[in-house]
Structures are given as structure tokens and as C-alpha cells.
A protein has these predicted regions:
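N-terminal cap/lid segment of alpha/beta-hydrolase-fold proteins
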Residues: 1-31, 87
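Short, surface-exposed "cap/lid" segments of acyl-processing enzymes
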Residues: 24-68
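Active-site loop signature of alpha/beta-hydrolase-fold enzymes
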Residues: 41-42, 72-75, 146
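Glycine-rich "HGGG/HGxG" loop immediately N-terminal to the catalytic nucleophile
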Residues: 67-84
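Alpha/beta-hydrolase active-site loop
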Residues: 82-104
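Alpha/beta-hydrolase fold nucleophile elbow
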Residues: 105-118
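The alpha/beta-hydrolase serine catalytic core
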Residues: 134-181
Length: 181
């Protein structure tokens, strides 16, 4: 039988809250899964998707956590230095989450984590993975939208074949060339 319990990271600068779902038996060599909130949606996830996913992971034998970063859902506002960038704050918060899970479940020697995220949760997972060797995988949905050459090709091709801008330009040209009397 899986168990769900409240998860808290209590630091002087911030306090984070979430729900951790435990499998019947925790296997120390198995990675645990962390799901940071996405955008303004708290740890329940879009249409409770994070709830359903963490429960399914626990039934499959994985320790799984859904958590709110600062200023979202149940978590507090940060009380510390304003000189940190948003990325630095996010990485610090997620590393504190990993540290707390590792301490609570005595996973010091085998700590591996897979991050799962939707949209900004995916981006935050990627940022953490770049900085923290404990992250062994990322499952990201709607991760990044880079504006590369194909983006611009599609964008401008659509613009060229839209009729209304051409008509508006033609009307402006005629209006300037032949003033209305």
C-alpha cells in the first residue's frame, strides 16, 4: 500500500511544501522522482496530473515527490538576498528539496533523481540537471521553444501569404498617392 505524506523543506530563507508518495518498499538503488510545479499551477498539477503520476510511480515502486517552489501554492515567499537571479534561486530551492529527500529517506550513498516537469517545471528541471550530478534524467513536456531558422521561416512564410496585410499596405499606398477629396 502506498503512503502519502506532507513534505517540508524548512530553511531560514524559504519554506517549501509538497506531497511525497512512498511505495510499499523503498529500494535505495532506485532513483526517486521530483515534480516541481509548473508556472502558476501548484503541486497538484494541471487537472491533478501530478497527483495521478506520483501515485502511479509509487505503485511501480518509486519514491515520488510533487513540490511547490517559493511563492507558489503552499510554499512561502523568500526572505533572503535579492541579489540572486531567478535561476539561482530556483536551483537553490530544488537542491534543498533533493537534500531533504536524501536526508529523510537515508539515501546518502545512492542518491539519484529523475526530474519530471511540464513547461516551466521542465525548464527548472533542466537548469538543475546542468548544475547537480544527482540528477540522472529529465522527463520534460513543453520544455523549450527556441526560435531557430525554421521558426523564422515558418513565421515569415505565413506572413507573406496572409492577404490582409497586403490589402492594408495597398490601401495606404493609394491613400498617400491619391488624396481623398
Amino acid at each position: 500500500m502506498i503512503k502519502e505524506r506532507i513534505f517540508t523543506v524548512d530553511r531560514p530563507e524559504f519554506e517549501l511544501h509538497g506531497v511525497i508518495v512512498e511505495p510499499e518498499t523503498i529500494i535505495p538503488d532506485r532513483p526517486f522522482v521530483v515534480i516541481p510545479n509548473s508556472g502558476l499551477v501548484h503541486h497538484v498539477g494541471t487537472c491533478r496530473s501530478s497527483v495521478q503520476f506520483t501515485r502511479a510511480l509509487a505503485k511501480a515502486g518509486f519514491l515520488a515527490l510533487r513540490v511547490d517552489l517559493c511563492q507558489l501554492g503552499d510554499s512561502s515567499t523568500r526572505l533572503d538576498n535579492e541579489s540572486m537571479t531567478d535561476d539561482e534561486r530556483t536551483i537553490q530551492e530544488l537542491q534543498a528539496v533533493l537534500d531533504q529527500v536524501i536526508t529523510d529517506y537515508m539515501l546518502e550513498h545512492t542518491a539519484k533523481v529523475v526530474m519530471y516537469g511540464l513547461c516551466s517545471g521542465s525548464q527548472n528541471s533542466f537548469k538543475l540537471a546542468v548544475k547537480d550530478d544527482r540528477v540522472v534524467g529529465i522527463m520534460g513536456i513543453d520544455h523549450f521553444g527556441f526560435q531557430n531558422w525554421s521558426y523564422y521561416c515558418v513565421h515569415y512564410v505565413k506572413q507573406v501569404f496572409r492577404l490582409s496585410p497586403w490589402i492594408n499596405r495597398f490601401k495606404k499606398l493609394i491613400g498617400k498617392a491619391m488624396p481623398m477629396v
